[in-house]
Amino acid sequence: MSTHIGAKQNEIASTVLLPGDPLRAKFIAENFLEDVICYNDVRGMYGYTGTYKGKRVSVQGTGMGIPSISIYANELIESYGVKNLIRVGTCGSINKDIKVRDIILAMGACTNSGTNRMRFNGMDFAPIASFDLLKKAYDIGKSKGLDIKVGNILSSDLFYNDDKDAIKLWSKYGVLGIEMEASGLYTLGAKYGVNTLAILTVSDSIVTGEETTAKERETTFTKMMEIALELAE
């Protein structure tokens, strides 16, 4: 056991999907995995292990924001030896060409968070995805006939941000969407030498105002889930 994860040793697979919403973790386990065990319910942050097409895979809720995902990622790596950590989450589009329900593979993750500035003594670090996972996910998506978007995203500490000019600036520099976790995950991947990737479904468009419901975000974004599960080794 670790501080926030109640699993015993060997109960967690080497590949773990990381949805922010613990109910999405439950949905993935119940609808995609076989021979499922629930290894964690500490703080209501469910974790499950099962098999997908014969391959062992786990799914662990993380909560929202860089501090929260960093807690779970740290413990999964340090206490349980996880090698592949794949965020499956949502983001808001800030690009007019990125539509609701599009899938984005986050090649890099900018941030306005102070966590990396603290970690690197005021200097900037460029958190990026693992190329192998990124390439495999892209190829899987294309083989399924999906229009996969690949590019930079922003991991923001602010969910409600009134500074529209800042959003326009990020968009001007090619950032595709905004979420709240990937930068922290990618930084820890670099620190520990493990593979990390964020696969994101666009849940709303900051450009057009179109959005999806909470239930849709929990249960209908299955294409990104399937791509992530196919990455299990």
Curated annotation (Swiss-Prot):
GO terms for cellular component: cytosol. The record marks 217 as: Important for catalytic activity. Its EC number is 2.4.2.1. GO terms for biological process: purine nucleoside catabolic process. It holds the Pfam family PNP_UDP_1. Keywords: Glycosyltransferase, Transferase. Phosphate binds at residues 20, 24, 43, 87-90. GO terms for molecular function: purine-nucleoside phosphorylase activity. It catalyses: a purine D-ribonucleoside + phosphate = a purine nucleobase + alpha-D-ribose 1-phosphate; a purine 2'-deoxy-D-ribonucleoside + phosphate = a purine nucleobase + 2-deoxy-alpha-D-ribose 1-phosphate. A purine D-ribonucleoside binds at residues 4, 179-181, 203-204. The active site is at 204 (proton donor). Catalyzes the reversible phosphorolytic breakdown of the N-glycosidic bond in the beta-(deoxy)ribonucleoside molecules, with the formation of the corresponding free purine bases and pentose-1-phosphate. The gene is deoD. Belongs to the PNP/UDP phosphorylase family. This is Purine nucleoside phosphorylase DeoD-type. The lineage of its organism: Bacteria, Bacillati, Bacillota, Clostridia, Eubacteriales. It comes from Clostridium novyi (strain NT). It comes from the Bacteria. Homohexamer; trimer of homodimers.
